[in-house]
Design a protein with these regions (language model features):
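Active-site and donor-binding regions of nucleotide-sugar-utilizing enzymes
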Residues: 35, 92-189, 194-198, 203
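Conserved N-terminal ligand/cofactor-binding loop architecture of enzyme catalytic domains
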Residues: 43-118, 122-123
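A nucleotide-sugar donor-handling region in carbohydrate enzymes
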Residues: 172-227, 231-234, 266-267
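Donor-nucleotide binding loops and adjacent catalytic segments primarily
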Residues: 221-297
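Acidic donor-binding loop of glycosyltransferase active sites
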Residues: 295-305
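C-terminal "capping" alpha-helix adjacent to the active site of nucleotide-linked donor transferases
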Residues: 338-343, 347-363
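A short, well-ordered alpha-helix in the C-terminal region of glycosyltransferases
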Residues: 364-378
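C-terminal alpha-helical cap of glycosyltransferases
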Residues: 377-399
């Protein structure tokens, strides 16, 4: 059972018990600020649809227009990519001013979208709302205070920490990544009875039992050669071209390197030019088969994003975390390394050494995979669906 839950705990935990009643129409409300939040939302959407429910996923900023979504999402991503230290200072400032007793500038900004969101909800007939992002939770909290919101709201945390300003929201439940996170969230003023340590949701394909031989065949990789996976992420990986060059220089005996560049076309093109003469380095752009590539590889290098790290841990691939973006990623890598789920290093040389250590030491890989199994919940998405179903049942029963 996930995270040490025993049967009697499950029976008494309102975050888990429940069951399917009528089919629901669910709104998943996110924002275009990095792919982690969206990936969590898509995971819940897929689980809802597999259970026979209707689910719509909406970028809240789009309700104000494409320009608003592009400006806010673009500004966030550019700040993280090109000025991570400034982002870290902003994050620290948020930690310094956070309080459950007063509203932050972030709340004041997000309440400006309340009228647009109200108009949208008035046109639709959603039974319940889930949000994997703080910003919609802020807007929904303002709407709730104004009496504009009839739906129950489930918030989903996508990092292994309570990021600033969750404490000023008023959602009905908060899905958090691990039972050990409960005390931190409570310390910031979140009600204990509203915290559900169900884990970060990932798509069901990541929970499929690994078959490396089949995965390597699908990916066109040699069946008998060790393979590294390098995930550049939607918001960058530092000096990935230098990292990849150094890793390829140190690889031996036909070891394979797969580099996934995501939607960054410029990076994909540059790296294909960089390695076009090296048949052991495979550079990809966007792919919808990340789970298969994880399955095909022996070790992954990735930034410590909460969602991408959870995907790798659920897939049970040994992880080397590269230097975090200051803020929540620092907390993510601290959680993973303290639980034996990854190795975290800040310099390229140490990161590559850590990857080579994991590649050569089977006992270390086995130990890390065991820690990953013990600290993740592959069925988080479905358990969130059960929670949403229970909320709808309660609303129907009280109406």
């Amino acid at each position: 059972m996930f995270l040490g839950f025993r049967e009697h705990e499950m029976r008494s935990n309102p975050c888990i018990i429940g069951g399917k009643g009528r089919n629901m129409k669910v709104l998943i409300l996110s924002c275009n600020t990095g792919e982690g939040h969206n990936a969590a939302g898509k995971a819940v959407k897929e689980c809802l649809e597999r259970r026979g429910h209707q689910a719509d996923m909406v970028d809240m900023m789009l309700l104000k227009g494409k320009r608003t979504s592009k400006v806010i999402g673009g500004a966030y991503v550019e700040l993280v990519k090109h000025a991570p230290r400034i982002f870290g200072l902003v994050y620290k400032a948020g930690e310094a001013i956070r309080s459950a007793k007063r509203k932050s500038p972030v709340y004041q900004a997000n309440k400006l979208l309340a009228k647009s969101l109200k108009d949208y909800l008035d046109q639709e007939n959603y039974d319940v709302i889930a949000t994997p992002h703080l910003y919609p939770a802020e807007t929904l909290t303002y709407m709730k205070k104004k009496g504009w919101l009839k739906q129950k709201v489930v918030a989903i945390g996508t990092d292994y920490t309570c990021i600033p300003f969750w404490e000023e929201t008023a959602c009905d439940y908060y899905v958090i990544p691990h039972k050990e996170a409960v005390e931190e969230w409570v310390s910031y003023g979140l009600p204990r009875e509203k915290l559900c340590p169900l884990g970060i949701p990932v798509k069901p394909e990541f929970a499929v039992e690994a078959n490396q031989e089949k995965a390597r065949s699908v990916c066109g990789l040699p069946a008998d050669k060790p393979a590294y996976l390098v995930m550049s992420g939607s918001m960058g990986f530092g000096k990935i071209h230098i990292f990849a060059q150094e890793l390829s220089r140190r690889c031996k005996d036909g070891e394979q390197i797969i580099i996934i560049c995501g939607n960054n076309r410029r990076r994909e093109y540059a790296m294909k030019l960089q390695f076009f003469k090296n048949p052991d380095v495979h550079v990809l752009g966007y792919t919808s088969h990340v789970a298969v590539y994880m399955e095909a590889c022996d070790v992954i290098f990735t930034k410590p994003g909460g969602l991408s790290s959870t995907e790798a841990a659920v897939k049970q691939i040994p992880i080397v975390h590269t230097a975090p973006i200051p803020g929540c990623e620092t907390k993510n890598v601290e959680f993973f390394t303290s639980h034996g789920m990854s190795i975290g290093e800040k310099t390229i040389e140490k990161q590559i050494r850590a990857g080579q250590f994991l590649m050569r030491d089977e006992n270390a890989r086995v130990k890390m995979k065991k820690a990953q199994r013990e600290n993740t919940n592959p069925r988080s998405g479905y358990e969130i669906v059960t929670l949403l179903e229970k909320l709808c049942q309660n609303v129907s029963g009280n109406s």
